[in-house]
């Protein structure tokens, strides 16, 4: 199938808007320039639309296998397509865990059968994510593992993490870490701050995260491993990562939209749609995250899309599971609150969600160039709509942003040369 995307605008290397047409043949971009339609070619009129590389999210939870009531690979991929994402990386805290070559092969086949966008599967660092016995890294890599993580829990012992890092380095794969010292969680459900005190809740202190990162960057230095910090959330953590980068340690970090947009002072009562892990931190932490993103300490943005059933989220703040969904709201929220207000340029947001995650992990995506995969998102920057969780394609409706008015909604998503979302509906 051949497509010609005409009349839209792209960003050049300086962030200037330039009008360009894009020809797609098969699964790749074949030409970019001022182009005329060829015979039999399908023309997509992108007049007034921002033509972006497909967005990239390297931290999602699709729950399959074992959690299909919350999400499946198919529904998660549909949510990604609606949100403008063409490449996502799925975390391994499923049941069973992808901790064997056979389980990874099953997962890769399931992705091929049901996903409308590119889904990169993480493998677990330890068997069943228990932290006790390391998985077969070589076998999992051969079966298609993107990287290794026990996300959902932190690897508690330094010895296990060090051995995992050495093994990962030997096969040129990254260790991706959920950073949390279990002895410092204290049964918490929110940040250990004013909100916790006012509502009589156990709090999770900032040091719970930062102390794990401090340990791990030293282990990564010793092992020669690429170490990536998931969903960084505290000013202390930002300081540790900044210092590690200055020391030449190969560390990267991501931050979520919700940690950039909200702090614990924004939680309206005991609303479990504001419960996630790591929790919303203090306003000072939020400012440190924004500064870390600006100065390059934090490399890119990832949603940590974490769907749950409505029944689960109707429990108390202490009992409800951690997590919110984010794939269908990330770009509009960030564009509205940071680009429309002049705090960021469109180029900065574009890079945080396309170029930079791909550069961090050496992925050949995130750019619009001839010869690259035809992963393209058309975004209407002027369209204003309210977030309506009832329209989500994800099974999860657990969002704190329901009803918020946003600009910058994806109008069409093309993944690997196939139209997967267009004008408010999926393209079959």
UniProtKB/Swiss-Prot annotation:
Zn(2+) 2 binds at residues 151, 178, 231. One of its GO terms (molecular function) is zinc ion binding. One of its GO terms (biological process) is 'de novo' UMP biosynthetic process. The active site is at 304. Keywords: Hydrolase, Metal-binding, Pyrimidine biosynthesis, Zinc. Pathway: Pyrimidine metabolism; UMP biosynthesis via de novo pathway; (S)-dihydroorotate from bicarbonate: step 3/3. InterPro entries: Amidohydro-rel (IPR006680), DHOase (IPR004722), DHOase/Allantoinase_Hydrolase (IPR050138), Dihydroorotase_CS (IPR002195), Metal-dep_hydrolase_composite (IPR011059), Metal_Hydrolase (IPR032466). Binds 2 Zn(2+) ions per subunit. Substrate binds at residues 61-63, 93, 277, 308, 322-323. The keyword Metal-binding applies. Zn(2+) 1 binds at residues 59, 61, 151, 304. Its cofactor is Zn(2+). It catalyses: (S)-dihydroorotate + H2O = N-carbamoyl-L-aspartate + H(+). GO terms for cellular component: cytoplasm. Gene3D superfamilies: Metal-dependent hydrolases (3.20.20.140), Urease, subunit C, domain 1 (2.30.40.10). Its EC number is 3.5.2.3. PANTHER family: ALLANTOINASE (PTHR43668:SF2). Catalyzes the reversible cyclization of carbamoyl aspartate to dihydroorotate. Belongs to the metallo-dependent hydrolases superfamily. DHOase family. Class I DHOase subfamily. This is Dihydroorotase. The lineage of its organism: Bacteria, Bacillati, Bacillota, Bacilli, Bacillales. The gene is pyrC.
């Amino acid at each position: 199938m051949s497509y010609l995307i005409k009349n839209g605008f792209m960003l050049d290397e300086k962030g200037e808007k330039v009008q360009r047409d894009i020809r797609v043949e098969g699964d790749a971009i074949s030409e970019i320039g001022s182009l005329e339609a060829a015979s039999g070619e399908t023309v997509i009129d992108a007049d007034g639309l921002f033509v972006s590389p497909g967005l990239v999210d390297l931290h999602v939870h699709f729950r399959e296998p074992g959690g299909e009531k919350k999400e499946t690979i198919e529904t998660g991929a549909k949510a990604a397509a609606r949100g403008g994402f063409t490449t996502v990386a799925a975390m391994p805290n499923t049941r069973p865990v992808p901790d064997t070559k056979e389980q990874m092969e099953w997962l890769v086949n399931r992705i091929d059968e049901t996903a409308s966008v590119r889904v990169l599967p993480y493998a677990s660092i330890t068997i069943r994510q228990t932290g006790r016995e390391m998985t077969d890294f070589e076998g999992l890599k051969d079966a298609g593992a993107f990287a290794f993580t026990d996300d959902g829990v932190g690897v508690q012992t330094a010895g296990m993490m060090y051995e995992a890092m050495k093994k990962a380095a030997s096969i040129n794969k990254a260790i991706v870490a959920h950073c949390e010292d279990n002895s410092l969680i204290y049964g918490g459900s929110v940040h250990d701050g004013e909100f916790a005190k006012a509502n009589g809740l156990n709090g999770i202190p900032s040091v719970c995260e930062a102390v794990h990162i401090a340990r791990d960057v030293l282990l990564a230095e010793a092992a020669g491993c690429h170490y990536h910090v998931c969903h960084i959330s505290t000013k202390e953590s930002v300081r540790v990562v900044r210092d590690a980068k200055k020391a030449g340690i190969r560390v990267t970090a991501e931050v979520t939209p919700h940690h950039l947009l909200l702090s614990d002072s924004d939680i309206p009562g005991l609303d479990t749609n504001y419960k996630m892990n790591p929790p919303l931190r203090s306003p000072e932490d939020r400012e440190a995250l924004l500064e870390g993103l600006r100065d390059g300490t934090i490399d890119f943005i990832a949603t940590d899309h974490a769907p749950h059933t409505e029944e689960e989220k109707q429990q108390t703040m202490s009992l409800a599971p951690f997590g919110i969904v984010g794939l269908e709201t990330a770009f509009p929220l960030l564009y509205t609150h940071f680009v429309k207000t002049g705090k960021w340029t469109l180029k900065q947001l574009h890079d945080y969600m396309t170029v930079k995650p791909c550069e961090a992990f050496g992925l050949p995506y995130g750019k619009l160039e001839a010869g690259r995969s035809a992963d393209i998102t058309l975004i209407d920057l002027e369209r204003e709509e309210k977030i309506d969780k009832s329209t989500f394609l994800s099974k999860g409706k657990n969002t704190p942003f329901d009803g918020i008015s946003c600009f910058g909604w994806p109008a069409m998503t093309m993944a690997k040369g196939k139209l997967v979302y267009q004008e408010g509906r999926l393209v079959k």
